[in-house]
């Protein structure tokens, strides 16, 4: 029997009466190479990590695919145990949930059309920029660059269509998923440089120190053994 079960639903699971033998991971599976669909299953770097966490707890992994801006609420309400979705750690999010140790360092990069007149990342601030709703890019521009006209979307694929349709001038998003998008869309390119760096952590309900300690133990082992780098290589081939 598989140690993980994928629920391809966008509905809420009730927090009460949950099976104690299941570890519920919440994610947004449109973020390759970290989590995405392949032949009907959700796969990726974060999924591999979650499998190891579930294995260490002797539990069955259940993966819940929802919109990114709802993920932390699922953790806060107890409807999910862990959240892995390329979640950048910042002070605002730390007020809502606890985070594991950092396990990935990322950069926020800029995608444009190849024939765009935007040639430098510093040129995007007075442009029309697509960001994922609730992402650190959303927060960054909202707080620090109010002159930027933001188009907030729930899905990266929608942002790509907006860019290709000239509805926005650029997309700002995480580097590895941006590279995956550009691989599949040859009329797009990533500008040299980046907007800012960020780090990913696993979100857990505040006060659940037992689970947090176990997650950190697993992450430390994976990092020290070079496994996370192996997962990244595996899913970016």
At which residue positions do the language-model features occur?
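C-terminal motif of bacterial Sec signal peptides marking the signal peptidase cleavage site
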Residues: 12-15
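Periplasmic-binding protein-like
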Residues: 27-29, 104-112, 175, 179-220
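Short helices/loops that flank or line small-molecule/ion binding pockets
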Residues: 56, 64, 69-82, 96, ...
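A ligand-binding cleft/hinge motif common to bilobed small-molecule-binding domains
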Residues: 87-95, 140, 164-165, 169-197
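Flexible hinge/capping segments at coil-to-helix
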Residues: 101, 112-129
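Ligand-binding clefts/hinges and TM-proximal coupling segments of bilobed small-molecule sensing domains
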Residues: 136-154, 186-194, 219-237
